[in-house]
From Swiss-Prot:
The gene is ASB2. Residues 1-47 form a transit peptide. One of its GO terms (molecular function) is anthranilate synthase activity. It comes from Oryza sativa subsp. japonica. It catalyses: chorismate + L-glutamine = anthranilate + pyruvate + L-glutamate + H(+). Induction: By chitin oligosaccharide elicitor and the phytopathogenic fungus Bipolaris oryzae. Keywords: Amino-acid biosynthesis, Aromatic amino acid biosynthesis, Chloroplast, Glutamine amidotransferase, Lyase, Plastid, Transit peptide, Tryptophan biosynthesis. This is Anthranilate synthase beta subunit 2, chloroplastic. Residues 70-269 form the Glutamine amidotransferase type-1 domain. Residues 15-35 are annotated as: Disordered.
Length: 273
């Protein structure tokens, strides 16, 4: 089992040039989740719009518990983040979005979110602002879903090593992903096996040094790359290497709905309101 001693030091390296450029390009008007001012109104409108779009369309709210406490989305300066938010809105989830350098872990803790979603993003886990520290400090007590960069943060937080993929960069590639059907309560409940997933990455969690004592591999590609993992003890910490929100991924909405169910299961187990 992983212990606190196994976690990596909370050291954030300076952003790489690619990450700095991505941050420079992002318009400041997308700052959501602040506590006052026009941006807060924008955040509220986005949440409402995401929820209303489903009320007028599909019945995606069915079976999903409504809760006023938000899911915190940590935006690692990635254009896919708001597609993930749209999926959460479609299943009736209340969420707030913060860039990875616009909020502290302590501030997130004070919000007491139902769950945390760590988005994709450029660079390595060291370029992800508070994302790595969030996994370390809040993951054990808060359901957490890491996507692409988010999974890599989970891997590093619990002793894994993030390396260049031996098969090079993939961008918008559809791959068959296989998952372990014997495991209950994963992001893949009810999905066909295998299913097609959209991949956009050059880094992976290294298989040879994978921290099997802390994490378990839950999905993989035909060539053996790790596509998903979860914590052995804190089973509410899960992540995927591919992009559920990509149009290439056939079952992305169901994975997001499964994350909400993981949150609900955690709340029931711990007698949370």
């Amino acid at each position: 089992m992983a212990t606190a001693a196994r976690l990596l030091p909370k050291i954030q390296s300076p952003a790489s040039p690619a990450v700095a450029e991505a941050r420079r390009r992002r318009p400041s008007s997308l700052r959501l989740g602040v506590t006052s001012g026009p941006a807060r109104t924008l955040k509220q409108k986005l949440v409402a719009k995401s929820a209303v779009s489903v009320v007028e369309g599909e019945n995606a709210f069915d079976g999903v518990k409504q809760d006023t406490r938000p899911i915190i989305v940590i935006d690692n300066y990635d254009s896919f983040t708001y597609n993930l938010c749209q999926y959460m809105g479609e299943v009736g989830a209340n969420f707030e979005v913060y860039r990875n350098d616009d909020i502290t872990v302590e501030e997130i803790k004070k919000i007491s979110p139902r769950g945390i979603l760590i988005s994709p993003g450029p660079g390595t886990p060291q370029d992800s602002g508070i994302s790595l520290q969030t996994v370390q400090d809040l993951g054990p007590s808060t359901p957490l879903f890491g996507v692409c960069m988010g999974l890599q943060c989970i891997g590093e937080a619990f002793g894994g090593k993030v390396v260049r993929s031996p098969y090079g960069v993939v961008h918008g590639k559809g791959s068959l992903v296989h998952y372990e059907e014997k495991l209950d309560g994963t992001l893949f409940s009810g999905l066909p096996n295998p299913f097609q997933a959209g991949r956009y990455h050059s880094l992976v969690i290294e298989k040879d040094s994978f921290p099997h004592d802390a994490l378990e591999i839950t999905a993989w590609t035909d060539d053996g790359l790790i596509m998903a993992a979860r914590h052995r003890k804190y089973k509410h910490i899960q992540g995927v290497q591919f992009h559920p929100e990509s149009i290439i991924t056939t079952e992305g909405r169901l994975m997001v709905k499964n994350f909400i169910k993981i949150i609900e299961g955690y709340e029931a187990l711990n007698c949370l309101p």
